[in-house]
From Swiss-Prot:
Subunit structure: Component of a hexamer of two molecules each of IL6, IL6R and IL6ST; first binds to IL6R to associate with the signaling subunit IL6ST. Interacts with IL6R (via the N-terminal ectodomain); this interaction may be affected by IL6R-binding with SORL1, hence decreasing IL6 cis signaling. Interacts with SORL1 (via the N-terminal ectodomain); this interaction leads to IL6 internalization and lysosomal degradation. May form a trimeric complex with the soluble SORL1 ectodomain and soluble IL6R receptor; this interaction might stabilize circulating IL6, hence promoting IL6 trans signaling.
Region called Disordered, residue ranges: 32-51
Glycosylation sites: 108
Natural source organism: Oryctolagus cuniculus
Protein name as catalogued: Interleukin-6
Similarity remark: Belongs to the IL-6 superfamily.
Known role: Cytokine with a wide variety of biological functions in immunity, tissue regeneration, and metabolism. Binds to IL6R, then the complex associates to the signaling subunit IL6ST/gp130 to trigger the intracellular IL6-signaling pathway. The interaction with the membrane-bound IL6R and IL6ST stimulates 'classic signaling', whereas the binding of IL6 and soluble IL6R to IL6ST stimulates 'trans-signaling'. Alternatively, 'cluster signaling' occurs when membrane-bound IL6:IL6R complexes on transmitter cells activate IL6ST receptors on neighboring receiver cells. IL6 is a potent inducer of the acute phase response. Rapid production of IL6 contributes to host defense during infection and tissue injury, but excessive IL6 synthesis is involved in disease pathology. In the innate immune response, is synthesized by myeloid cells, such as macrophages and dendritic cells, upon recognition of pathogens through toll-like receptors (TLRs) at the site of infection or tissue injury. In the adaptive immune response, is required for the differentiation of B cells into immunoglobulin-secreting cells.
Family matches, as SMART domains: IL6 (SM00126)
One record GO biological process: positive regulation of multicellular organismal process
PROSITE patterns on file: INTERLEUKIN_6 (PS00254)
Signal peptide: 1-26
Length: 241
């Protein structure tokens, strides 16, 4: 044992060789990684790194923002004309306190179920919006939003229990939507599209906050509860369970 130790002492060369041996055994070589990726072909990519979901939501929000600007020729008043949007008789998904996404009643399972089912409903609305825009660029953007929403659903679905895979629009809702989108009146058609895109924006913004809280974990929740309680004892963190 002493002779082996003394053999490594003469100068920095021995230390360098020892370090190289440790590094070589600690990390896999490039060949097996390539072989594994070729054989398994990463089927579902369900192991989403932390933060990837948040990046995806932000990207979708930015695409929707640009799409609405193009539809209104960058007229802010057009994008936020509430009195016009109020005339659209559609009840879009939204997150409320009972969905368990925010303090004080945080419930991850309930929240993820509501987020995923809401996204699936918005996906059906987006499918009806295909090829309903004035320009090819706008149609391309809404197709991109739909594709990214589908990917987001695929990412969240493995984490959700009791999800209804057969979600469909209610017949009355589907009829009302199609009537608005097939109107010769371009104003009503455009207003309906804006209404759906704004509803999706609001839903995604709340989803972003909820997912951010889940990924941050208890430090964020305790900070939130601490500031809300004004010095009172904060409850145990629901995200610990």
């Amino acid at each position: 044992m002493n002779s082996f130790t003394s053999a490594l002492r003469p100068g920095p060369l021995g230390c360098s060789l020892a370090l190289l041996l440790v590094v070589a055994t600690a990390f896999p070589t490039s060949a097996p990684v390539r072989e594994d990726s070729n054989t398994k072909a990463s089927p579902d990519k369900t192991l989403t790194p932390p933060g990837r979901t948040i990046e995806s939501i932000r990207s979708i929000l930015e695409t929707i923002k640009e799409l609405r600007k193009e539809m209104c020729d960058h007229d802010v008043n057009c994008m936020n004309r509430k009195e016009a949007l109020a005339e659209v008789n559609l009840h879009l998904p939204r997150l409320i306190e009972e969905d368990g996404c925010f303090p004080p009643a945080v419930n991850n399972e309930t929240c993820l179920l509501r987020i995923t089912s809401g996204l699936m409903e918005f996906r059906m609305y987006l499918e009806h919006l295909q090829a309903k825009f004035r320009s090819d660029e706008e149609n391309t953007r809404v197709s991109m939003v739909l594709k990214n929403i589908q990917h987001l659903i695929k990412t969240l679905r493995p984490k959700v229990k009791n999800l209804n895979e057969e979600a469909t629009l209610k017949p009355a809702v589907a009829v009302s939507l199609m009537e608005n989108l097939q109107q010769k009146n371009q104003w009503l058609k455009t207003t309906t599209i804006h209404f759906i895109l704004r509803g999706l924006t609001n839903f995604l913004e709340f989803t972003l906050r909820a997912v951010d809280l889940m990924e941050c974990g208890c430090p964020c929740l305790r900070n939130f509860m601490g500031s809300a309680s004004h010095g009172q004892n904060t409850p145990s963190c629901p995200l610990d369970t």
